[in-house]
Amino acid sequence: MATPVEPPNGIRTPGKHYYSMWQSLFEIDTKYVPIKPIGRGAYGIVCSSVNRETNEKVAIKKINNAFENRIDALRTLRELKLLRHLRHENVIALKDVMMPIHRRSFKDVYLVYELMDTDLHQIIKSSQTLSNDHCQYFLFQLLRGLKYLHSANILHRDLKPGNLLINANCDLKICDFGLARTSSGKDQFMTEYVVTRWYRAPELLLCCDNYGTSIDVWSVGCIFAELLGRKPVFPGTECLNQLKLIINILGSQREEDIEFIDNPKARKYIKSLPYSPGTPFSRLYPHAHPLAIDLLQRMLVFDPSKRISVIEALQHPYMSPLYDPNTDPPAQVPINLDIDEDLGEETIREMMWSEILEYHPEAATAAMEVVL
């Protein structure tokens, strides 16, 4: 449990209380009690809590020094802008963003999400038995959430087991939208924070300029294979090794299947790899349902133009017991996520402040009155 502490300057801010957790100060709204640490990483610290006003269990993520690294700050801003518009049962809900005390100098950001029990990475590496029904239900929910994102013109671009949150009912929600982009975006994909290599589509590994929703489908295929085999299907050590592992399993590609590679050096590299007949997925996953194997091999297709789409995957016979298109509406409007990658710290802070105000209409009204 977190330890209640006095504020660092001895002055309490109305509506806030203070906790120490893993040598970090949490300055949070008094409606959230108690708080208990549940995880930490490069992104910050996450704790569980209860909203006293709604009695709802939540996860509070504190992002320390949110503007110290510009790329991290842009990721946070992108997630805020996106999640404000998304409403789907297979996409994590951002419930609140705590109001900072000082508009022009706040450093930390507190995001409040619905609370989930674990993630798919933890489940895959556990000793828990995963039946065909489990695999089918997880895949169905992932595809459903992804169909909604793609209907909003959003590419997730970082799908992996650790970004799929699960609760005790086996409900699945997609999270971590810091790398998401609009599918029409012209920005540079290969930032210094690239998508986890093991789930990266061939067209990204080969630095192709034109990529689309099929990159997310490839990631889903990798995740599905990992569910079936309880280990990553393409655990590459670096980019070229990743491509070798893919060719070893899918087999050497025909000339027509590498026409999408617009980089001559990349195409030459693929053609230089030793011939591989490939390994059938039915041999890799002998206990998997035949329809699961059929769907998997339609998702893990080297040429993105021949890869199955999310809607086609949901209509596949393996998904038919679960999928009802009439209960699966698309997003209301496409979302524009284009953000200037060259924004400075102060501009990002101001844009983030504007996003936070969306969760606090009373503060937004007060700010307008001050301006007037």
From Swiss-Prot:
| One of the record's GO molecular function terms | protein serine/threonine kinase activity
Give the E.C. number(s).
Answer: 2.7.11.24
Q: Which residues bind ATP?
A: 38-46, 61
Q: What keywords is this UniProt entry annotated with?
A: ATP-binding, Kinase, Nucleotide-binding, Phosphoprotein, Serine/threonine-protein kinase, Transferase
GO CC terms: cytoplasm; nucleus
Q: How is its activity regulated?
A: Activated by tyrosine and threonine phosphorylation.
TXY, short sequence motif: residues: 191-193
Query: A Pfam family for this UniProt protein?
Result: Pkinase
**Location of Phosphotyrosine modifications:** 193
| CDD domains according to UniProt | STKc_TEY_MAPK
UniProt cross-references to SUPFAM superfamilies, sorted A to Z: Protein kinase-like (PK-like)
Swiss-Prot/TrEMBL catalytic activity: L-seryl-[protein] + ATP = O-phospho-L-seryl-[protein] + ADP + H(+); L-threonyl-[protein] + ATP = O-phospho-L-threonyl-[protein] + ADP + H(+)
- The catalytic residues are 158 (proton acceptor)
Q: Which intervals of the chain form a coiled coil? A: none
Q: Which residues carry this modification: Phosphothreonine?
A: 191
Q: How is it modified after translation?
A: Dually phosphorylated on Thr-191 and Tyr-193, which activates the enzyme. Very low autophosphorylation, although dramatically increased when Mn(2+) is added to the reaction instead of Mg(2+).
Q: Which PANTHER family match?
A: MITOGEN-ACTIVATED PROTEIN KINASE (PTHR24055)
**What's the protein here called?**
Mitogen-activated protein kinase homolog NTF3
What is the organism field in this record?
Nicotiana tabacum (Common tobacco)
- Which gene is transcribed and translated to give this protein? NTF3
